[in-house]
A protein has these predicted regions:
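Extended active-site neighborhood of metal-dependent phosphoesterases/phosphodiesterases
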Residues: 3, 64-174
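Active-site-proximal beta-strand elements of phosphoester/diester hydrolases
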Residues: 8-18, 134-144, 178-180
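N-terminal active-site segment of His-dependent metallophosphoesterases
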Residues: 1-69
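Active-site neighborhood of phospho(di)ester-bond hydrolases with catalytic His/Asp-centered motifs
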Residues: 12-15, 43-48, 81-87, 177-180
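Active-site environment of divalent metal-dependent phosphoester hydrolases
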Residues: 20-22, 51-54, 83-95, 145-148, ...
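Active-site-proximal segments of metal-dependent phosphoesterases and phosphodiesterases across multiple
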Residues: 63, 172-189
Length: 189
């Protein structure tokens, strides 16, 4: 369970590390420095953690090793972390669903992908203050297209969000404050 501490809850977002098999020491230095400075209660890796179809060629062990190294700074500090996917993650030759299962093997990972809606890693994280639900994080898959690289949030994901939001409001008698994380911004017209 994630909780406020002294009326605060710090989230550190890490995006676009875009690493391959050999993780740059500069990337790890940056992550470690940010964790030490911010002292977050949660880290959100918000897409394109890894990339490189020619680099990984679907090799699960190599992919798991790189993801483990990228999240090890959180694991070593016992800081909960979660993810959403970007447009390059699946280009490593392993589906986002398979990668999500890898993340679930790591210490300190939080999140469970919702079923029966488009995408992977659509999930909600509840943040409490004592027993009271204070805040929600909606993590939403913005998909990718292997041909052009980008896609967007699908209609049934928006409907999922609305249903979840409304069910929380009905259960708690108020709209629960929230933030969303996704890789690609929502389309607007």
């Amino acid at each position: 369970m994630l909780s406020f501490k002294n009326d605060t809850f710090k989230i550190l977002q890490i995006a676009d590390t875009q690493e391959g098999k050999k993780i740059s020491p500069d990337t790890l230095d940056l992550i470690n420095s940010a964790l030490d400075r911010v002292e977050p209660d949660l880290v959100v890796y918000s897409g394109d953690q890894i990339w490189g179809k020619r680099t990984f060629k679907g090799n699960r062990d190599a992919i798991k090793n790189s993801l483990d190294i990228l999240t090890k700074p959180c694991q070593n500090r016992k800081i909960p972390f979660t993810i959403c996917f970007g447009n390059h993650d699946r280009q490593v030759g392993l589906s986002n669903e398979e990668q999500f299962e890898i993340y679930k093997e790591f210490d300190c990972f939080v999140g469970e992908s919702e079923k029966d809606i488009d995408g992977c890693a659509n999930h909600i994280i509840e943040i409490k203050d004592g027993d009271e639900l204070k805040f929600l994080l909606y993590l939403i898959d913005s998909h990718s297209n292997l041909e052009i690289g980008y896609d967007n949030v699908h209609e049934n994901q928006i409907e999922w969000y609305k249903k979840k939001r409304d069910s929380y409001e009905e259960k708690y008698g108020r709209l629960i404050p929230f933030s969303t994380f996704r890789y690609v911004k929502f389309l607007s017209f």
